[in-house]
UniProtKB/Swiss-Prot annotation:
This is Placenta-specific protein 1. Belongs to the PLAC1 family. The gene is PLAC1. GO terms for biological process: placenta development. It comes from Homo sapiens. InterPro entries: PLAC1_fam. The keyword DNA-binding does not apply.
Length: 212
């Protein structure tokens, strides 16, 4: 009960911060398999532009999708030293840090980032035009926008594309082609769960419950 009260308090504080700043400098999204952090170049203040090469996630993971208005880190929850804590049978909290080291000044910052995800949730990414390679799956017409879905069963597969992971055929292990995200306008992602918690969590095997 205390855990859920704490989560509710942090959501309230996060909402208040976003409303006060006018634009959220950082967004954290996650699923049971993936962790995504989107950072605004003016994350510190309006006078300091942070360059993407001055940032890394966790244990040295650089942003893997850079745009003029945002830097995005998208990694598996088993990478970059991301920590996990099962707070219930249905909910896991993932946490790590964004490290900033200025190239022109001695300034350094460590910003904790966390996100809560249900243990059986799929990850829905932004629409991405694709052709489905497997006949056993629903097919999409050329240039039709489809939502990519991936979950824990595909965690052993690593697609090679710019956008977050494409759909794989589990029967044929065939990768669905995915257009690079840079060819599309950035569209806001709709998180099913959003949370930013500064408390440090550590991963213990015994904590991972049930379907983990």
């Amino acid at each position: 009960m205390k855990v859920f009260k704490f989560i509710g308090l942090m959501i309230l504080l996060t909402s208040a911060f976003s409303a006060g700043s006018g634009q959220s400098p950082m967004t954290v999204l996650c699923s049971i398999d993936w962790f995504m952090v989107t950072v605004h170049p003016f994350m510190l203040n309006n006078d300091v532009c942070v360059h993407f090469h001055e940032l890394h996630l966790g244990l040295g993971c650089p942003p893997n999708h850079v745009q003029p208005h945002a830097y995005q880190f998208t990694y598996r929850v088993t990478e970059c030293g991301i920590r996990a804590k099962a707070v219930s049978q249905d909910m896991v909290i993932y946490s790590t840090e964004i490290h900033y080291s200025s190239k022109g000044t001695p300034s350094k910052f460590v910003i904790p980032v966390s996100c809560a995800a249900p243990q059986k949730s799929p990850w829905l990414t932004k629409p991405c035009s694709m052709r489905v390679a497997s006949k056993s799956r629903a097919t999409a017409q050329k240039d039709e926008k489809c939502y990519e879905v991936f979950s824990l069963s595909q965690s052993s597969q690593r697609p090679n594309c710019d956008c977050p992971p494409c759909v794989f055929s589990e029967e044929e292990h065939t990768q669905v082609p995915c257009h690079q995200a840079g060819a599309q306008e950035a569209q806001p992602l709709q998180p099913s769960h959003f949370l930013d918690i500064s408390e440090d969590w550590s991963l213990h095997t015994d904590d991972m419950i049930g379907s983990m």
